[in-house]
A protein has these predicted regions:
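Oxyanion-binding "anion nests"
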Residues: 105-124
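N-terminal Rossmann-like NAD(P) cofactor-binding subdomain of oxidoreductases
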Residues: 1-92, 97, 117
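Glycine-rich beta-alpha junction loops
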Residues: 42-45, 69-76, 101, 126-132, ...
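Active-site-proximal loop/hinge segments within enzyme catalytic domains
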Residues: 83-86, 118-142
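Short gly/pro-enriched beta-turn/loop segments at secondary-structure junctions
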Residues: 61, 92, 103, 117, ...
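Single conserved hydrophobic/aromatic residue that forms the stacking wall/gate
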Residues: 158-167
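Short, conserved charged micro-motifs
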Residues: 145-153
């Protein structure tokens, strides 16, 4: 099972898991209305799709070769002390971690696949910054032929409208 592969565990209550609905309201509002159990996406699994979904949903960019280049503050790395989030290692520097094996990869791909109706695979590169809080997703995609910069700009400026129109 994919969950076991990426998270290294199993569901405590499989029945509850089967009842859960994925809860990114910007895109799946109708699916979560009235539900009792909503699976809440985390940091990267929220910011990455929000950055590119309007362009994908409106057919402006290719769903192939998407790169999610993300940065987060050290608090996003969890509470467990590790070499990578130890102050002397992180202070005045930053680094990529879990490149090509981060557990949020399939969740981002799942969201973008649902929005596009195609199988989307991404290259996801998270970075840890020496700041207490914050997150940034810069997402790269090839612009489809005939699409203008103005179309991309307008789509991303009016994210909620664009997402609501297609998602």
């Amino acid at each position: 099972e994919e969950y076991t592969e990426w998270y290294g565990g199993t569901f405590l209550d499989k029945k509850l898991h089967e009842q859960a609905v994925y809860g990114l309201p910007e895109f799946f509002r109708d699916k979560i209305k009235g539900k009792k159990l909503i699976a809440n996406p985390g940091c990267y699994t929220t910011c990455s799709p929000l950055a590119i979904a309007p362009a994908i949903a409106n057919g402006l960019v290719s769903t192939k070769g998407i790169i999610c280049d993300c940065k987060s503050g050290v608090t996003g790395a969890g509470r467990k002390p590790t070499q990578g989030n130890h102050f002397p290692e992180l202070n005045e520097g930053f680094h990529a971690y879990k490149v090509a094996c981060h557990r949020h990869t399939p969740e981002i791909e799942q969201t973008l696949s649902k929005l596009s109706g195609e199988d989307v695979t991404i290259t996801f590169v998270p970075h840890l910054l020496p700041v207490n809080r914050g997150i940034l997703a810069t997402v790269y995609a090839d612009i489809n032929e005939g699409v203008t910069f103005e179309q991309i700009r307008n789509c991303l400026l009016y994210t909620s409208d664009a997402a609501d129109d297609k998602a």
